[in-house]
Structure formats: C-alpha cells, structure tokens
Amino acid sequence: MPKGSGKVIAQNKKAFHDYFIEETYEAGLVLQGTEIKSIRAGRVNLKDAFARVHNGEVWVHNMHISTYEQGNRFNHDPLRTRKLLLHKKEIEKLAGASKETGYALVPVRIYLKNGFAKMALGLAKGKKQYDKRHDLKEKEAKREIARAFRDRQKM
C-alpha cells in the first residue's frame, strides 16, 4: 500500500491464495452516496471481484457493497459494475498486460485515504495447484519454527 494510506476496509485474501500479485496500482472508485456510507461501515466484499479494461476504462465486476441500512428507495444495487479511476498510461499498461495469457486484474484491498475510497488493484498471474500446496507447506513450516522458538523461550 502506498505511503500515507489510511484505514483498510476490506482485503481480498483469496487473491493472494489463487494468484501471484506482480504489481499493484492505486485506483479511485466512482461511487454513489449510499455506497460510500456502506464502505465506511465496512460492508464490502471483494471475494469474487475482478476488473476488466473496456473502451479505455477500467471497470470492477462482482464487488459486493451491501445496501445502506438507513438508505431509502434510492439505495444502490449491491453488485453493480463500478468504474475505477486511473491515469491513462496505467490503463494502457494494464490493458496490454491483461491481454497476455494467464494474467488478470484482481482487487486486493479497499481503503480510505484522505476521506476518499481507494482500491489497490493487482496485476496477477494464476497459481497452479502445486504452487498453492507449496505455499501452504511454507506457511506451516514457519508456524512450526515460531512455535519451537516460543516453547524454547518459556524454558
């Protein structure tokens, strides 16, 4: 996350399990009034979200922002497609990279920065099943080492 960033609202842990995140970009979100209120309340889910470049614009799909509790009949659609704000050169770079086989644009986290909702968008390459198993083995080994050090400290 860039320096000076604010409060993290939601993280996409599944993205780190399913993909190698090679680069991340900070993108602004085009939101409606009730959507930002729901985000500030922490009612957002990035689990199945993905982004696509279409006509020189980046759009995020399947990002679920729950309806605002105190909203009236003008409440938003929870799964609507939302536009992301990026610089033109970043969009061109993402468009070229996402056309390559095996690459995807995945939302990594949503956070508030200076009162505005921002999204960390990752350029990701899919993991194979054996990569996932290897990561789990490494994680378990680190846990075992930490546990051994803790037990040794107690003695």
From Swiss-Prot:
One of its GO terms (biological process) is trans-translation. The lineage of its organism: Bacteria, Bacillati, Bacillota, Bacilli, Bacillales. One of its GO terms (cellular component) is cytosol. This is SsrA-binding protein. The keyword NADP does not apply. One of its GO terms (molecular function) is RNA binding. The gene is smpB. It is found in: Cytoplasm. Signal peptide: none annotated. Pfam families: SmpB. It comes from Bacillus anthracis. Required for rescue of stalled ribosomes mediated by trans-translation. Binds to transfer-messenger RNA (tmRNA), required for stable association of tmRNA with ribosomes. tmRNA and SmpB together mimic tRNA shape, replacing the anticodon stem-loop with SmpB. tmRNA is encoded by the ssrA gene; the 2 termini fold to resemble tRNA(Ala) and it encodes a 'tag peptide', a short internal open reading frame. During trans-translation Ala-aminoacylated tmRNA acts like a tRNA, entering the A-site of stalled ribosomes, displacing the stalled mRNA. Keywords: Cytoplasm, RNA-binding. Belongs to the SmpB family.
